[in-house]
UniProtKB/Swiss-Prot annotation:
Residues 340-375 are annotated as: 3 X 5 AA repeats of E-S-G-X-V. One of its GO terms (cellular component) is ruffle. The lineage of its organism: Eukaryota, Metazoa, Chordata, Craniata, Vertebrata. This is Layilin. The gene is Layn. It is a single-pass type I membrane protein. Glycans are attached at N117. Residues 25-235 are extracellular. SMART domains: CLECT.
Amino acid sequence: MQPGAALQAMLLAVLLAKPRDSKGRLLSASDLDPRGGQLVCRGGTRRPCYKVIYFHDAFQRLNFEEAKETCMEDGGQLVSIETEDEQRLIEKFIENLLASDGDFWIGLKRLEEKQSNNTACQDLYAWTDGSTSQFRNWYVDEPSCGSEVCVVMYHQPSAPPGIGGSYMFQWNDDRCNMKNNFICKYHDDKPSTTPSIWPGGEATEPATPLLPEETQKEDTKETFKERREAALNLAYILIPSIPLFLLLVVTSAVCWVWICRRKREQTDPSTKEQHTIWPTPRQENSPNLDVYNVIRKQSEADLAEPRPDLKNISFRVCSGEAMPDDMSCDYENIAVNPSESGFVTLASMESGFVTNDIYEFSPDRMGRSKESGWVENEIYY
């Protein structure tokens, strides 16, 4: 028996003899960090060793290239399953996890450069760690050799059996960008650490971080980059809205000023505009005075006594029968006593003008003036 086969058989016997609730289980979601794992080696130091990485949260799972790089950074490779015994050993590792649905990446991938019309699909696949083993555990009608290049080991406990039987632990080609769990394998060049003893004499190494410090720094950088991109996206939304906000502020201010001015104009009296358009004539400067009111204001002395410095102008209507259009009467400027004349003209030095608006007609003239004549009266300054 080869040494590798003996190691695998011994590990398998230890796993089968160990109770499931013992402290020697491979991985525990409560004990291990989701991005950590535990090496399982024969005797604690003999190679190869394995580390099964399972994520309860599907969002934390990795695609094929990410899983491959993670194993390499930890000093290993994606697992290459070279014999049927090793396949059963990996199955026991996964069963010991009591894990729910979630496939596992293995280190088998199709090589596009080997693809030709004469090459069978299954012959295009090779192990990424350089192993030349031809052992395969494909499900029925797999691989499909379409756009699915990378290979997973089925782990769907809740899935019903298909046409080829149970899917559990069978191989299937899948798209490399899918998110899955993965298994790392560590060969003889992996340095050993102080192991912990399992029941039955076997030992395992303590849980070690799956990702080194450099990978954690990269995760921090990625988180910072995502936050910065989110801040930039928010800035791209807010900056174009600033001119619109300023326009709204200016428009609101202009409307508010206009409304205030309109209210102020409505509350002011409108007499100023009316005076400007239709000025009220001042009575002291108007030539159309009410002579009757002026006469009432004059004293009886002005009405009774003539004054030597005033010139009385009297008018007399023609006594003829001519029509008003042909009227050519004589008029006389006679200074007579108001009591002797047939009509009276008044003059006032205080008022600055002469008015003659009171006419006393004799009875015989009164009748004739009504029938054939009319009288003109004017104001002389």
